[in-house]
Curated annotation (Swiss-Prot):
One of its GO terms (biological process) is proteolysis. PANTHER family: AB HYDROLASE SUPERFAMILY PROTEIN YCLE, MONOACYLGLYCEROL LIPASE. Keywords: Aminopeptidase, Hydrolase, Protease. InterPro entries: AB_hydrolase_1, AB_hydrolase_fold, AB_hydrolase_sf, Peptidase_S33, Pro_imino_pep. NCBIfam families: pro_imino_pep_2, ProImpepThrmp. This is Proline iminopeptidase. It catalyses: Release of N-terminal proline from a peptide. The gene is pip. It is an enzyme of class 3 (hydrolase). It comes from Saccharolobus solfataricus (strain ATCC 35092 / DSM 1617 / JCM 11322 / P2).
Length: 310
């Protein structure tokens, strides 16, 4: 475990980095803890199989008095693989999250932000452990894998004929590693995953971890729109009405996890707020960083000021 201290905007921030022992394996975490603050944000990266690295812009929220916790989920980034292959599930992920919450924040409630697959994990957590939440943020997340895949297939139909034809051809052959197919997949990503000319280094690190580990392939599949892993049938849309904590839903206009997916969640969580980032695809925290952080900060400020409830 390591520590270092920084001071920003008058806040004293202790950055703690290390491992927590959870269910017999080491889970990596990084905590930006603000002296004297009880406002807690826990972040969930996507994948499944990514790492916390690409979410690091959210660390800036500690400059405004918000404790920010990042971690690499089981089988991801710097964390260990689960001991049992049957643990590559969303259910195991939410129990891991609850154990980490207890170890880091004790009895304190949290605001939970999940991005992409992390948004699905955040929803699953809220459905079981809502009593520990001050608020929920579903950022380019989903409540139904089948519906999300259906929406991604619609986006493929809107691609230029060249790429659409290539994707369909190699999918029919079951050849997901052909260079021509991978080139078409990368074009899809350039439109709907990240629309920046240069990929930021933290995003590169996350993709490097995805390539090194087996979690993405086990839980998801060969790529973003071919989901054949353990999460392929996951759908909790009909349970969303049970979520009653303040909820923010964000999505990019060009998102691979589409606006329609976000609207489905918004429609089923009473009182939720939906924000669409007009110049973003799947990574608004990079594509519209300042606006994204402003929206997240505003929501957290509102959640912690509501009747001054603790």
């Amino acid at each position: 475990m390591s520590y270092y201290f920084i001071t920003m905007k008058g806040y004293s921030i202790n950055v703690e980095e290390g491992y927590k022992r959870i269910f017999g394996i080491n889970i990596y975490y990084k905590l930006y803890r603000v002296k004297g603050s009880n406002r807690n944000l826990v972040t969930l990266h996507g994948g499944p199989g990514g790492s916390h690295d690409y979410l690091i812009p959210l660390a800036d929220l500690s400059n405004y008095g918000i404790n920010v916790l990042f971690y690499d989920q089981f089988g991801c980034g710097r964390s260990d693989d689960p001991k049992d292959t049957s643990d590559y599930t969303i259910d195991h992920g939410l129990e891991e999250l609850e154990e980490l919450r207890k170890q880091v924040f004790g009895n304190d409630k949290i605001v939970l932000l999940g991005h992409s697959y992390g948004g699905a994990l955040a929803i699953a957590y809220a459905l079981k452990y809502q009593q520990f939440l001050r608020g929920l943020i579903v950022s380019s997340g989903l409540s139904s894998v089948p519906y999300t895949v259906k929406e991604m297939r619609r986006l493929i139909e809107e691609l230029p004929d060249k790429y659409k034809t290539i994707i369909k051809r190699y999918e029919s052959l079951g050849d997901f590693k052909n260079p021509e197919y991978l080139d078409a997949v990368n074009f899809f990503y350039s439109q709907h995953l990240l629309r920046l000319k240069e990929m930021p280094e933290p995003v590169k690190r996350t993709f490097e971890y995805i390539g090194k580990r087996r979690t993405y392939e086990i839980m998801n599949g060969p790529n973003e729109f071919t989901i054949i892993g353990t999460i392929k049938d996951w759908d909790v849309t009909e349970q969303l009405y049970k979520i009653t904590v303040p909820t923010l839903i964000t999505v990019g206009k060009y998102d691979e996890v589409t606006v329609n997916v976000a609207q489905l969640i918004h429609k089923n969580i009473k009182g939720s707020r939906l924000v669409i980032f007009e110049n973003s695809s799947h990574m608004a925290m990079w594509e519209e960083k300042d606006k994204y952080l402003e929206v997240i900060k505003e929501f957290i400020d509102q959640v912690y000021s509501l009747n001054m409830v603790k």
